[in-house]
Structures are given as C-alpha cells and as structure tokens.
Regions:
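Carbohydrate-binding/catalytic loop surfaces
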Residues: 1-4, 42-77, 120-143
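Surface-exposed beta-strand/loop patches in extracellular or lumenal glycoproteins
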Residues: 210-219
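C-terminal beta-rich recognition modules with glycine/proline-rich loops and embedded aromatic residues
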Residues: 25, 98-200, 205, 239, ...
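Short, flexible surface segments
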Residues: 223, 252-253
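Solvent-exposed beta-strand/loop surfaces of large extracellular or lumenal domains
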Residues: 222-247, 266-271
Length: 335
C-alpha cells in the first residue's frame, strides 16, 4: 500500500511540478533500496522481532538492514515488486541516472520474471528466496491483490526497454524487440539470447542517414563489454553502471553488437556476511535441492567451485567439499 501511495506522489509531481513530491519519491526509494531490499531488488517480509497478529506475515518492512531472519517461505510480495518497478521507471525517466536502470534490470530478471510459471502461466503471491524453499502458485480462481498486479506487470514487460530524449535513444534492457522512434523516423531492432547469452545485436532502419546518440546501458554487475559497429571494434572506455554513448550519423542497415563479460559473484546479506546469494552475470541462481544449503570455505573458495554444467543448458555446478550442487537461474525454476 505504501509504494502505491508513493507512486501517487510521482504522478502528482509529473502533473504539477511540485518539488516536494519528487523529493518524497527519491527519499523513499533510497530508504527502500539501501535498507530493506533483498539481493534481487524486491522487498517485504515478516517482522520476527515484533509479536503481533500480523508480524509473521510477509508484507512488512522491518528494522533497517535486518533481513537475514526474514527468509520465510512467504516474502517479496509480487505487488511490491511491480510497484517498485514503477518507481524505478519514474525516477529514471526524470533523471537518467544509471542507478535506477541497474535496479530495474536486476528486478526484471530476478524478481519479475520468476513470479510466473513458465509452463502454466500461474503467478506466485510471494517469491521465496530462502533455503530450502519452493514456489507456491495462486489458483486460477484466486482474486488477490497480486493477481491484478502480476497481470499488469506481465502486460507491460516492454515498458522499460527503451527511453529517448530529443537527440538520443537509451537501451536499458536487452530484450529481443523492435522500436520506432517517430520523431527521428528511426527503427531499431534488437536480437539475442540475453540474459542467458552475453551477446546482443542491433540493426538500424532509416530512410536517409540521421544523426543521433545510441546509449547502451552497462550494468554494475559487469566488469567489461566490447562493442562493434558494422563489424569494427570500438575503442571506448566502458564503466559499470553507466551508458556507453555511440554518437554518429546512422545509415540504413547499420549494425551494432555488444558483448558483455559475465562472471560468477556472491552477494551477502547486509546483516549476515556468511548468508550468500550466487549470481552469474545478471542472473540470480537457485540451488536445485530440497535440503538446506550449507557451504564450506570462504568466498574465494566457493567461487572457485562454480562452473557450467555444460555450455548450452544454462545450468551450473558448484563443487564444495565433498558435495556437488546443481544451480539454474531463478526465473527458470518452476517449482
């Protein structure tokens, strides 16, 4: 409910220009992301330090940065995820700040897509993130708040891919798609297997050569990317959490390729250093096990045990001590 109110502040700022409402939205976002968000950018959980009738339900924000004891089976309400994405989109459209694009991308792949079953289309009310946990889907005849929020979220998956101003187009998400920029009479087609594959291709369509800037988002999780224009490698500085600017006169059929550098990484809970999440590139990985996952060694030793199960399946292996775990992207888990 609170996030919906703050989204109302955003609409009021856009309608009236009242600065206090813009500040309210930005301050709320900072509090949410820096003190209450899980590794995939979403939030909400129980309040185990409080004893009330509703304290153990998964629709609270508790003490700031106290998250490790909230990983019950029901956390990360889908309404919270959807409405946080609306905040991310508003703040980016006002500022162009890459930090909002970073959170939007993280949530898109690791909080939004995982709430829907790939086989049935059903949605979860809460997205479990602890260990061991499984997804519990709503029934076809359920009519909960998240039933509507999820339907809206999946009807608007294309909303955050592209932005533009008078002279530039911004690519915030890497999703196979086409966009037509009416003011410049420019078409842009995007292709590739991102996020499973690190290569994305673009093709420009114009009636006559036109000048504009193509801004490609470089997420915080990558330590490098290589860009080619019409097959020629571009010698450009690439910084995480920024936009790589390609400014030129574009002709019909011009091609751009970006190749991201993927790596495994571990992210800790803010209040418990040894409670970890495993990522590969942009993807949050889930363990394929019914048991509590307890790992041995320090972070470097755990990272050294991670590898691909094979090059095509999108599955991963973690060899840790005498045990071997299988992992896959959270959005690919159906149960």
């Amino acid at each position: 409910t609170h996030i919906v109110l703050v989204n109302g502040f955003a609409r009021r700022y856009e309608s009236t220009g009242e600065e206090c409402y813009r500040k309210s939205v930005a301050n709320f976002w900072n509090m949410l992301m820096h003190s209450h968000a899980y590794v995939n950018g979403t939030s909400s959980g129980p309040r185990p330090n409080v004893t009330t009738e509703t304290s153990l339900t998964a629709e609270h924000w508790g003490e700031p940065c106290h998250l490790c004891n909230t990983l019950t089976k029901g956390i990360a309400e889908s309404c919270v995820t959807h409405n946080t994405q609306r905040l991310n989109a508003s703040l980016f459209s006002w500022t162009g700040n890459p930090c909002y694009a970073d959170v939007y991308m993280n949530m898109f792949y690791n909080a939004v897509l995982p709430v829907q079953s790939r086989s049935t289309g059903a949605y979860v009310y809460h997205l479990p993130l602890g260990s061991p946990r499984h997804k519990a889907y709503m029934a076809d005849n359920d009519f909960k708040c998240c039933s509507g929020s999820c339907a809206e979220a999946f009807a608007k998956l294309n909303n955050g891919i592209y932005y533009h101003d008078d002279s530039a187009v911004y690519v915030n998400l890497y999703v196979p798609s086409k966009v037509h920029w009416a003011d410049k009479k420019v078409g842009l087609e995007q292709a590739g297997g991102f996020p499973v594959e690190p290569i994305v291709d673009f093709t420009v369509s114009v009636r006559r050569p036109v000048d504009f800037v193509l801004n490609l988002f470089i997420p915080a999780w990558t330590d490098g990317a290589v860009v080619y224009v019409n097959g020629e490698k571009q010698e450009m500085s690439v910084r995480p959490s920024s936009f790589l600017k390609l400014s030129r006169r574009w002709a019909d059929g011009d091609r751009v390729r970006i190749e991201f550098r993927y790596a495994f990484r571990l992210q800790s809970m803010p209040d418990k250093e040894n409670m970890l999440a495993v990522f590969y590139g942009p993807m949050l990985l889930a363990f394929e096990t019914r048991d509590e996952v307890i790992l041995k060694g320090n972070k470097d030793e755990i990272l050294a045990g991670l590898s691909f199960a094979d090059s095509e399946s999108g599955r991963f292996v973690l060899k840790n001590g005498e045990r071997e775990f299988r992992l896959r992207p959270l959005f690919d888990v159906d149960k």
